[in-house]
């Protein structure tokens, strides 16, 4: 594991430092000292250089150093299904394309290979942590470790048989076994991940809620994604899925409710009061014509709103810069309030607020002593589209781009240097890319 390798101290000297320590203050002439996997100190550049002459100096001129981005909802392995199911509404997308494809193809090898590609795409775009929900979480984790990303893997349950498991009990047992297997890895974390109200029973939800309490983990679940999910539940159960979640005791600070496109004012108030999080995935919601989540109302109610890309089969990119920009612009346009979801709040929703949602506030999402060194250096003065720089926060929020991310560190290890994956990672990703063109493309088309 990474953390057993001793790394030299690294002293990073960026032109600008954006700590996002629940504030959007931009500092200049600062240095950040990394010791092993941790941020050890932050201070004035000259003082730090004198105090740590032995540290390996990494000069970052024309760049801003900031916390790595946190993608709060994805299905990484679905990178192999990118472009396999387009221009369909959610129900048709799942029933006619995705579930049949997964039934045929989604084995351990599929999950490993797809997650390797996704982790590479995300790291190169400045995403250092992804919150995943998929089958074979042991493979998800192995892929993340091999590429160098931090991962929150889901102990996923969907109550129908797949290649991975037959019924709820087995899904849970396999998930717990995977968690035990990787318990010594400092970049591997877990969530309890029931798929959705329409694929998981009350008994299983109750059991998973208990498990989340017992293991102190977040609960990661799709909720109110489409209008039909809500109306079907009303005619079937006489109650909206959200109210059912309330009865089951799921609406609390552990809950990361994904999509929430069809949440009403009362439900948003309840989420805010209980400290639940809304994970907003605007591109997927637009592409599947699910609608536009009530983000302005959620923020006004005091709900913690964070951002996810969803999987590449419904986005079709894993680009958090683009996702965040879309989230903010949609929020303004849909609410008629140009001040809604401002730049600073957007950047925090992809860093410190995302960490809070994952119960990892003291671990990631900010640049502060004692936190994990998950950092990205973003070029802000090298290309025409990056200038001028009189408002860095606005620049990053509204015109920041994956192609501007130069260097990436995860747990103190530099995994991307000058936009390229470092070391063995590049070879691994190259191999899987070739295999995808040779093997997976054909297999996906065959099921087609």
List PLM regions with ranges.
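Active-site microenvironment of metallo-dependent hydrolases
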Residues: 2-30, 34-40, 45, 51, ...
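Divalent metal-coordination and catalytic microenvironments
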Residues: 15, 32, 37, 62, ...
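Active-site gating loops and adjacent loop-to-helix segments of metal-dependent hydrolytic enzymes
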Residues: 80-113, 147-169, 226-254, 274-277, ...
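Alpha-helical scaffold segments that flank or form the walls of functional sites
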Residues: 82-148, 171-184, 433-437, 445
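Metal-coordinating catalytic core of metallo-dependent amide/deamination hydrolases
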Residues: 139-261
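Catalytic core of soluble alpha/beta enzymes
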Residues: 225-255, 260-273, 286-299, 311-322
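His/Asp/Glu-enriched, well-ordered alpha-helical/loop segment
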Residues: 247-254, 296-382
